Amino acid sequence: MKITYVGLIKVCFLVFLLLCATVLLNISWRQRDSSQSLQHCNSTCSAKYLETKLKEAHLTGRHKKWETYRLDAKPTSATGQGHQHFAKEPLQIKDLFIAVKTTKKYHGNRLNLLMQTWISRAKEQTFIFTDWEDQELRQKAGDQMVNTNCSAVHTRQALCCKMAVEYDKFVLSDKKWFCHLDDDNYLNLHALLDLLSTFSHSTDVYVGRPSLDHPVETVDRMKGDGSGSLKFWFATGGAGFCISRGLALKMSPWASMGNFISTAEKVRLPDDCTIGYIIEGMLDVKMQHSNLFHSHLEHLQRLPTESLLKQVTLSYGGPDNKWNVVRVNGAFSLAEDPTR
């Protein structure tokens, strides 16, 4: 019995030695294969090898399929403030929904200017939202004039009422971009298309110019119990702003079918501030700040003349500051062309 037990131990020891030898041999062969692969990689990944293959590709024409995919392409500044974006999609005027907010007393002096200038180049894309059924304007604009039936008084409620109608009409359209303007804005359509073409309408885009140099802080009446505060940026409506369709649809719970008015009442903010509240405060989407939009609150004479063609919107001073206009050299004097 003892002899059998000792013999079994010897057999097990021999089997163990054989297994160890097999493992060592496998490790040795794998290291050899790895060394050969590394040598092959070093030879085919060298700069000299790649340059040779690149020349061969140019000679055979095989590179043409990929020549538009430039890894070293430099993005261009889109918003005019250092923000950089790659071009996403071709854009045409027909893809825009341009909403112009106005009121009865400005149908004559302000709207006539717009109808004679930039609106004439985008008649089918521009909708005029007003508070009075003006038959003369109806004849000029047709169905592009929208009587909101909102109050003509310049109050938060009246402004939000018009913005609510603007939003709902855009959502019902098939347009890719919603752009809001005031009736004292001049719109450079080419510059607007250049700007929006750098984004995708299916992504979350909210672009405009803030009127303040800091975010607004207000009581958070929507998310919490009203004891906390919320900070957010908003694009001033006086300079104009644009929202992508993808983002506009996400705003629906707080903006569609009259909800915009109730949201504005809860947070007690005007129309453009409420837009920023919904986008930044509720949806947590950051506004794209752009200095290509301009309102009458700016010192417009400081804009360099050579940069005017690059600006998306321009404006002019009101009765209290009628000389606040851009500097433009031309055949007409300031008295003849007061809004420039």
From Swiss-Prot:
Glycans are attached at N42, N149. Residues 26-340 are lumenal. Gene3D superfamilies: 3.90.550.50. Its main location: Golgi. Pfam families: Fringe. Residues 1-4 are cytoplasmic. One of its GO terms (molecular function) is O-fucosylpeptide 3-beta-N-acetylglucosaminyltransferase activity. The active site is at D272. Disulfide bonds join C150-C161, C179-C242. It is a single-pass type II membrane protein. Mn(2+) binds at D184, H296. InterPro entries: Fringe-like_glycosylTrfase. The keyword Nucleotidyltransferase does not apply. It is found in: Golgi apparatus membrane. GO terms for biological process: regulation of Notch signaling pathway. Its EC number is 2.4.1.222. Keywords: Developmental protein, Disulfide bond, Glycoprotein, Glycosyltransferase, Golgi apparatus, Manganese, Membrane, Metal-binding, Signal-anchor, Transferase, Transmembrane, Transmembrane helix. GO terms for cellular component: Golgi membrane. It catalyses: 3-O-(alpha-L-fucosyl)-L-threonyl-[EGF-like domain protein] + UDP-N-acetyl-alpha-D-glucosamine = 3-O-(N-acetyl-beta-D-glucosaminyl-(1->3)-alpha-L-fucosyl)-L-threonyl-[EGF-like domain protein] + UDP + H(+); 3-O-(alpha-L-fucosyl)-L-seryl-[EGF-like domain protein] + UDP-N-acetyl-alpha-D-glucosamine = 3-O-(N-acetyl-beta-D-glucosaminyl-(1->3)-alpha-L-fucosyl)-L-seryl-[EGF-like domain protein] + UDP + H(+). Belongs to the glycosyltransferase 31 family. This is Beta-1,3-N-acetylglucosaminyltransferase radical fringe. It comes from Xenopus laevis.
